[in-house]
Amino acid sequence: MRIAVLGGMGFQGRAALADLAASPPVESIICADADLTGFESKTGFFDTAKVTAVQLDASSSAELEATFRDGVDVVIDLLPRQLTETVCLAAIASGVGVVNTNYAYSIAHLDPQAKAAGVTIMPECGLDPGIDLILYSLTIRQFEEIHVINSYCGGFPEKAACDNPLNYKVAWTWEGVLSSTRRDARAIKDGRVVTIAGDKQHESQWIQSIQFPGLGRLEAIPNGNAVYFTDLLGVTETIRETGRYSLRWPGWSAFWRPLKQLGFLSDKPVKGLPCDISPYQFLDKLMGPELQYKKDEKDLVALVNVFEGLSAGKHIRRRSRREGTGLPGGRRTAWPPRARRCPIRSCHPGSPAGRGIAAPGSRPAAPTRRPWSTPAGRP
């Protein structure tokens, strides 16, 4: 099997390369990135005999297709979400499958094209979204009627690496983190759908606090469309409470709340400057380089899913919890590349898996549930 890893020089990309390099079914790997500077030093912790480095402009469909048609079977896309559709279209044109970690709804409209081309595209194959959604599907099967689904997930530095006011460092893209701080959230409270505007996301009324064994108190911020997934699973009609929350060390919301009020996340260019630059662009370029992991620092992830409902006529509560740490020096992020192993096999041209867009969160809980629906206001 020949795998192309887009964004192979990034934090997650290097972890994926190491995992693939140790996998016997993988015969060769393309590490594709716009900047290959330091390839030898950044990949020195694993055997690179099967790896070929290729400089690639991922915004160019022509370059993507040329790379994919060089004997590639499956593409692992670890690029920013802005490039997801471009990558998927190039993969469809080239007849190769794609695994990525972004939400499915941004490329749902490509399903007919992918099916017509006999291509499988599997989004949401990371931790969040990904493993959390698989746990959704597995756990709700234990209930006759599900009332509560709350998901809490986050990646952040271990305590020893918390040396800045945010107590946060970047394991993927800083712009992606910034974008999530102003994203609207949809939840269900007391049986009613609630929309939490992105500019209100860090207000104290929406912030929760949870205790995580071994880590202590963590801050939980509403983020993402929880109703989208209960609709896909066909359980929204019985849900009384659902939400998706990002976990951070305490103080995250207190940091962002005044910055939002002062317009630091605005896209509007600031008048009086010698060039058109917005506060959002400024924060991206200023803070991103300052929030990188140092050589011997580790990241960690925490995931908690809480379920409540009826089973055998009794009210029960289920909790699934996961914690993990990465290796030092950015050699392997805690965000699990192994979560992509099964999707890679499913996307292989020889796999019997169904074609089109196939995400972990797109399977109904059971055939007796109500059919899939299209929620109003889906992002």
Spans of features found by a protein language model:
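N-terminal Rossmann NAD(P)H-binding glycine-rich loop of SDR-like oxidoreductase domains
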Residues: 6-9, 13-19
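N-terminal Rossmann-like NAD(P) cofactor-binding module of classical short-chain dehydrogenase/reductase
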Residues: 73-76, 98-99
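Helix N-cap at the beta1-alpha1 junction of Rossmann-like dinucleotide-binding domains, i.e.
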Residues: 10, 34-38, 105
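Rossmann-fold NAD(P)-binding glycine/threonine-rich loop
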Residues: 102-123
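Conserved Rossmann-fold cofactor-binding substructure of NAD(P)-dependent oxidoreductases
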Residues: 57-70
